Amino acid sequence: LFLYCFIRDLPKNTLTVVAIFSPIFILYPLGEIEVLIRKEVFLFIGFVIFLILSSPKKNKTNSMFYVFFIFPLLLLIWEPFIFFIPFTIFILLINGDEHQLKKNVFKISLCLSSSFFTIIYIIINPLSPEQHMVMSNGLMDRFGEHCYTSCSLLKTKSSIAAQFMAVFNNITFTGFFRYFIIMLIGFFPLMILIYNSFFKKLFFLNKFEKLLIPFSITLLLPILLFTAMTDWGRVVNMIYTFSILTFLFLIKNDLIKLNDKVLYFDYLYKTKKKIFIILFYVFAFGWNPKTQIKGDIATNTLYKILYNSSKHMLDFKSKRLFQDSPLIKFHKKYIE
C-alpha cells in the first residue's frame, strides 16, 4: 500500500517501468516467498514513509523528526539497516538549503545521532549465551517454537568477526561471478536511467551535475554487506530496492531530468512491440536470484509467483502439479 501510494504518480516512460519490474525488486520476494517474512520488509516500509515525508511540498522538519525517532527502532529490528543510511543522507542533502551547507550538515548529524548511538550500543553489548538461552526458552514457552536458524545465528554470529568469517568460508569464484552477472543484468535498466539523469540544480557545492557520481558514492557502504551476509540474494534485493526507491523519489519530485536518449526505449516499444514484450518477459519473469550465496539462479519466476501465491491463499499444501512430466524433467536437467 505504501509503495503503491509512492509510485502511482510517477512520470511515465518505458525504461522506468522495466526498472520497476526488475526481478531483484518487487518480483523477487514473490519468487522467493520466504523473503516476505524477513526483517527487511520493515526497513522498506520505513524508508518509503521517510521518502513520502521528504517531499519538497511538505515541511522539511517532519522527515528529520521521523529519522530521529523511527530509525533507531528500525535498527533494533535489524542492525544492518545502518548500511543504508547513506540513502537517507543523500535525500536530506538534496532537500537542504545549498547555500547553508554547514547548517544543513549539522541538522542531518543531529537527526541521525539517535541512530548512531543505537548502533554503538548494539555493538558494545553483544548477545551473551545466557541471554540467548532466555530468548530461546521464551520462544518455546510462549509460542511453542524451537530456536531455528535466524534465532541460532544470534548466538553463533554475535561478534563482528563471525559475520565476515561465514562469507569467507562459503565464497567461491562461481558464486562471485554468478552474482556479478545478476547485478549487472538486474541493475541494467536502473543504471541506464541514472547515467542519463541530471540534477535540475547543481548538487553539493555545485560540484555535481550528473546523478551518477553521487549515487555511486551512496552505494559504497551498502555493498559492504556482501562481506557480512551469506544471503546474497537478499543483499542484492535490498540494495536495488533502496536504490530504485531513491531514484523514483528524485524523478517524482522533479529534482532530476532525464536525457532524451532514454526515450529510445519508448520508440523501441512502439516500433518493435512484439520483440520488446518477449525481451521484457524474459528479463522480468524468466529468472531470479536464490537467497543463499551458494544457490543457483532460479527460473520460471512467473510460474512460481502464481504457484506460491495460490498455494498460500488456497492452501494447496505444497502439492506440485505435473512434477513428473517430461517437460519439467527436461527443464530441471538442461535449463536450471
Where are these regions (language model features)?
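Membrane-interface alpha helices of multi-pass inner-membrane proteins
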Residues: 63-91
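Transmembrane alpha-helix segments characteristic
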Residues: 203-225
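Signature aromatic-anchored transmembrane alpha helix within multi-pass, membrane-resident enzymes
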Residues: 111-112, 256-287
